[in-house]
């Protein structure tokens, strides 16, 4: 099965008030767990590779070929989006598209809005004729993830409206209080601003840094237009805690499969739980495929 664009998937999710999870991949076994979870839940899924991990994972072509091969070997029948997370430049986004990625995020959020819009327009122009979806970001999500470090800077409503109207993006990540990594204290999301941004942009919104946000707040973000929710830290914590417990009980263990398998199973269960929480379980639909 080829990868699919997330454009139609997110439009469907927004219309029917559920969200599709983006789960970041950290290697072959990790990817396998995400795909297994999606197939068992009959949920569409967004498998994402952070631009800051692309080289660690072997490069754009390696990531694309690995995920495509797993889809074929595992007979995955649900829609799978292969997404570049936090693309650092238009050039990097183009490399991902050329390698077979079906969706990209251009992260110009640390630049002035005019530069952000210019970069985003360049990516949309390249992606659009190739049926590849594009996500952009306004404002700054705080915390640290895959080397991305920063403080929270709320998205400006006017800038959100501008970038949507001037670029033709398919999804918008508007920073409204979420953070990458673990939360220090309770999350403090800007629901009032969220509602207004959803109203003026009228496109699917993306929630970054969703790990650790309580289920009732997640449900509220979905009601307010979020159709894509990004999860990474919760999966990493599940894997790490399980792996640590294995070594604590078996300090002399050295066979990788023996200690990796329980951790990967923990990742899979975390993904399945999130799919149910987001309401995407049972929502697998057919959409446009991107051949690689």
UniProtKB/Swiss-Prot annotation:
Cofactor or coenzyme needed: Zn(2+)
Catalyzed reaction equations: 6-phospho-5-dehydro-2-deoxy-D-gluconate = 3-oxopropanoate + dihydroxyacetone phosphate
InterPro entries in the record: Aldolase_TIM, Class_II_FBP_aldolase, FBA_II, Fruc_bis_ald_class-2
Lineage: Bacteria, Bacillati, Bacillota, Bacilli, Bacillales
Keyword Transferase: no
Pfam families recorded: F_bP_aldolase
SUPFAM superfamilies the UniProt entry points to: Aldolase
EC number: 4.1.2.29
Binding site for Zn(2+): 86, 180, 208
Record-given protein name: 6-phospho-5-dehydro-2-deoxy-D-gluconate aldolase
Coiled coil: none
Top-rank lineage group of the source organism: Bacteria
Binding-site residues for dihydroxyacetone phosphate, renumbered to this chain: 181, 209-211, 230-233
Family: Belongs to the class II fructose-bisphosphate aldolase family. IolJ subfamily.
Organism per entry: Bacillus licheniformis (strain ATCC 14580 / DSM 13 / JCM 2505 / CCUG 7422 / NBRC 12200 / NCIMB 9375 / NCTC 10341 / NRRL NRS-1264 / Gibson 46)
UniProt pathway annotation: Polyol metabolism; myo-inositol degradation into acetyl-CoA; acetyl-CoA from myo-inositol: step 6/7
GO biological process: fructose 1,6-bisphosphate metabolic process; glycolytic process
């Amino acid at each position: 099965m080829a990868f699919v664009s997330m454009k139609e998937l997110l439009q469907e999710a927004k219309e029917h008030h559920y969200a599709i999870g983006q789960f970041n991949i950290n290697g072959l076994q990790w990817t396998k767990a995400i795909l297994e979870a999606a197939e068992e839940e009959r949920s569409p899924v967004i498998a994402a590779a952070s631009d800051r991990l692309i080289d660690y994972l072997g490069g754009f072509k390696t990531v694309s070929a690995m995920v495509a091969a797993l889809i074929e070997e595992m007979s995955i029948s649900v829609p799978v989006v292969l997404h570049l997370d936090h693309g650092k430049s238009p050039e990097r986004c183009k490399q991902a598209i050329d390698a077979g990625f079906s969706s990209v995020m251009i992260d110009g959020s640390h630049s002035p809005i005019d530069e952000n819009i210019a970069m985003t327009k360049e990516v949309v122009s390249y992606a659009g004729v190739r049926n590849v979806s594009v996500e952009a970001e306004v404002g700054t999500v705080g915390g640290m993830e895959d080397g991305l470090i920063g403080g929270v800077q709320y998205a400006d409503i006017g800038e959100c409206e501008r970038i949507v109207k001037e670029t033709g993006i398919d999804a918008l990540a508007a920073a409204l209080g979420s953070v990458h990594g673990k939360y220090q204290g309770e999350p403090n999301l800007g629901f009032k601003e969220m509602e207004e941004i959803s109203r003026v942009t009228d496109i699917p919104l993306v929630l970054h840094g969703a790990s650790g946000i309580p289920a009732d707040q997640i449900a509220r973000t979905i009601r307010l237009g979020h159709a894509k929710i990004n999860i990474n830290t919760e999966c990493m914590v599940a894997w790490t805690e399980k792996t640590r417990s294995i070594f604590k009980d078996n300090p002399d263990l050295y066979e990788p499969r023996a200690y990796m398998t329980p951790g990967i199973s923990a990742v899979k269960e975390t993904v399945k739980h999130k799919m149910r929480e987001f309401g995407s379980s049972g929502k697998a639909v057919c959409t446009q495929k991107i051949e690689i």
